[in-house]
Amino acid sequence: MEGRGFSGLYKNSSEELFLKTVMESPIGMPVPTMEMLGFKTVSQSFRADSEELFKRWLTNEEGYNSTSMGLNSRLSKRISTELVNVSNQQHVGVASEGRNNDKSCLQNSFLTNDVSGDFNFPIREPVDRELQSGNLFLAKAWFLTDQRMTRSRSSELRRRYTEMQNTQAPQGLDSMFMAPKHDANIIKEELAHFNGFDYLSMCEIPSQKGSFMSPSNSSSSTFNTQQLVDVDKVSSCVSMLKGTLQRKRLECQVEKDAAEDGLNEIFGIREPLFQSGFNEGQENWNHQKLVNVQGDFTDQVKDTGVIETLEGAANFVLEGFANQTSQIHGGTASGEPSQSESSAAAPVISSGLDACEGPSNSSQTLCDSSWKQVGESTQNRAKGVREQIMDNLKDDRKRKRLERYGSVTSAVSDDKVDTTKKRRVERSRKMAEAKERNLTPTIPSDMQAVMKRCENLEKEVRSLKLNLSFMNRKDSEQTKQIEDLQKQNEELADEKERLLEEIERLLSETGKI
């Protein structure tokens, strides 16, 4: 497990660890939720395939043959080993922040090898194994179907799971989740005895509640300790199965926010980068939630260069948040006693980020300064990105304005030919011509009458010219016909003379006879 990251553990065994705790719980202890295991800050996208993981786990781990029992014990041992590693990564490294990193890794691996075998003894009892097989049989009967996990399906699972839990004998909560301070010290001494280390401060409380417990006994704190209430097992189980619905709802909400917010609101500071809340009634600490800066930026800005710059800024925010996690836990896990007068007060819940009113010796100033440095660097980086984006937008507007007025080269204008622009230019030209005609100087009325008469005469002349041309065309045709008739008349006259001569000749011959 050395060198294995927090997200890698979540990908491989977090779902199996959670479900194993649900189905193999021997004394009815409350099911540790993902918030208790410390996975609150991990992205919601890792829970997309929770239903598929649950089905595969039930199918492979129920134990149809004889070899499954040994496999089950080996898997239990591996899961418990990973559980101890999770606790060590969260708490042991925080409590020993004064030591170097190499020594911390050696302690974590040594603690894992020694304690892993002792975490499994309640699971291997015969009665618990029989109860586990019954639970697995009921669970597999529910989840071997191919139906998708919907709201109605989730309600049915909740009802059946409640009936199954009611049939079992109710037992008390595990002292690990309700342990007071002296019980925590006992567990701490036992773990220290296994490993030979005596400075483990927060490893005894595996829940997320314990990671924020401060041993300070200052009476100036505003929160009072209350006993932990019972955690709803059904809600913890069904919340994992409804991961897909929650992820889709979150994506819809993000898209809706991106559509409503404008470009100016994105560049402004809309909300703090990290949000924290504390519910005093239920005593559940909500981790800091990272605002989805990258999603909003990439939805609004379409330029490739701008997108790369914004992704770099978002990655910077994520890296800063990851680097500050250990420092925050170090501030909250301070083991030095308070200097106030009240030494018998119960442990109080300390956020590690609020200012202390009493003279408590902790590393809150270190956390505050670290958060301030992260905030200032992030603000400066975001300011530079905002200025660059605004400059690019201004340049784009100037270029479009110059193209509209024709101040850019013809190549750019030819590339963006627009019919609307052509119609606008033609309309403006016609309006200019009409305006020039309307700007002629005024003349007297008699001159206007004369000009009107002249215009009428011009029209008549044009009509007469048309008529004359028509008549000339007609005359030319008639002239041609007349010439043809005259030629025929001459031919007929010649023929008449010839006939007359012939008649005279015949008469003369007749007279001679």
UniProtKB/Swiss-Prot annotation:
Spans of biased composition, class Low complexity? 334-347
**InterPro entries reported in the protein's UniProt record:** CYCLOPS
Q: Does the keyword Coiled coil apply?
A: yes
Where is it localised?
Nucleus
Write out the ranges of the annotated region (Disordered).
Answer: 327-435
Gene disruption: observed consequences = No visible phenotype under normal growth conditions, but roots of mutant plants are impaired in the interaction with rhizobia, specifically in infection thread (IT) formation in symbiotic roots.
| Ranges annotated as biased composition (Basic and acidic residues) | 384-396
Give the signal peptide range: none
Q: What's one GO BP annotation on this UniProt entry?
A: arbuscular mycorrhizal association
Q: Compositional bias (Polar residues) spans?
A: 359-381
- Which domain of life does this protein belong to? Eukaryota
Q: What are the record's GO terms for cellular component?
A: nucleus
Q: Which UniProt keywords apply?
A: Coiled coil, Nodulation, Nucleus
List GO molecular-function terms, semicolon-separated: sequence-specific DNA binding
Q: Where do the coiled-coil regions begin and end?
A: 447-513
* Nuclear localization signal, short sequence motif: residues: 397-401, 421-424
Q: What is its main location?
A: nucleus
What protein family is recorded? Answer: Belongs to the CYCLOPS family.
Give the function comment from the record. Answer: Involved symbiotic signaling. Required for root infection by symbiotic rhizobia, infection thread (IT) formation, and nodule development. Required for symbiosome formation (i.e. the release of the bacteria from the ITs) and subsequent symbiosome development. Involved in arbuscular mycorrhizal (AM) symbiosis.
Kindly provide the name given to this protein in its UniProt entry: Protein CYCLOPS
Source species: Pisum sativum (Garden pea)
Its lineage opens with: Eukaryota, Viridiplantae, Streptophyta, Embryophyta, Tracheophyta
The gene from which this protein is expressed is: CYCLOPS
